[in-house]
């Protein structure tokens, strides 16, 4: 009888020990699982952050932090198709910093880069609607895409852009006619036809044509393009 009780006690003790071992094993497994899940969550967050960073770098100009040239073209094509579908106007504004080469020669490239950064921030402040885009088009040239904006509306915004850049009060090069950095600004507008492809109406060519005319006239002015490029750009505005 004593042997049976002893065996039972030993068995109970073994079962208790086994239960404790199972509990501790499960506890360790639970803790380890929680650690793995937390590590996976952190890794997923890091990967998503890296993906967003890569996406931003692929669409953003590294100097000015506005959209780059490729993103501008993609955005313009997308907005062109939307405007064609909805029968709405679409406008472009091109901006060129006046006498920028002379500025770089006098003050150095680092100072020139700082001017471009400030101009980029200025443009982003003036054009703040979610459906619009500010991009660096080429060197000292910027481009703005204005969705659902007609000719008079884009011209008004273009004048705001010209004035805002002048009001930055950035010192100009000695050979520039102005004391402060100014910009030549040009606009073009179209209402895409339903039967047309986006390439058929070259808003870029029209706006850049007007931009060349604005530069040739001395800068610090806004011109609105003739979309057919017949005759000179119209609505010249000059501020001296």
Please provide the spans of the model-predicted regions:
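Conserved nucleotide-binding and Mg2+-coordinating catalytic segments in signaling enzymes
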Residues: 55-74, 95-108, 117
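Short catalytic/binding micro-motifs of nucleotide second-messenger systems
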Residues: 125-131, 163-177, 211-213
């Amino acid at each position: 009888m004593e042997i049976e009780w002893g065996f039972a006690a030993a068995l109970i003790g073994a079962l208790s020990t086994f239960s404790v071992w199972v509990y501790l094993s499960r506890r360790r497994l639970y803790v380890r699982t929680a650690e793995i899940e937390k590590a996976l969550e952190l890794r997923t967050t890091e990967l998503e952050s890296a993906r967003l960073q890569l996406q931003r770098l692929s669409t953003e100009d590294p100097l000015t932090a506005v959209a780059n040239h490729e993103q501008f073209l993609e955005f313009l094509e997308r907005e062109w198709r939307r405007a064609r579908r909805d029968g709405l106007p679409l406008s472009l504004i091109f901006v060129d910093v006046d006498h920028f080469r002379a500025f770089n020669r006098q003050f150095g490239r680092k100072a020139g880069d700082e001017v471009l950064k400030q101009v980029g921030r200025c443009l982003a402040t003036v054009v703040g609607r979610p459906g619009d885009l500010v991009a660096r088009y080429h060197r000292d040239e910027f481009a703005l895409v204005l969705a659902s904006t007609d000719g008079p509306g884009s011209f008004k915004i273009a004048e705001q852009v010209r004035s805002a850049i002048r009001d930055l009060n950035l010192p100009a090069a000695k050979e520039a006619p102005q004391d402060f950095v100014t910009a030549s600004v040009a606009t073009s507008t179209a209402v895409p036809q339903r039967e047309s492809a986006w390439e058929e109406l070259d808003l870029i060519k029209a706006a850049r044509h007007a931009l060349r005319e604005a530069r040739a006239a001395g800068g610090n002015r806004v011109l609105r393009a003739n979309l057919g490029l017949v005759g000179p750009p119209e609505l010249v505005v000059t501020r001296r």
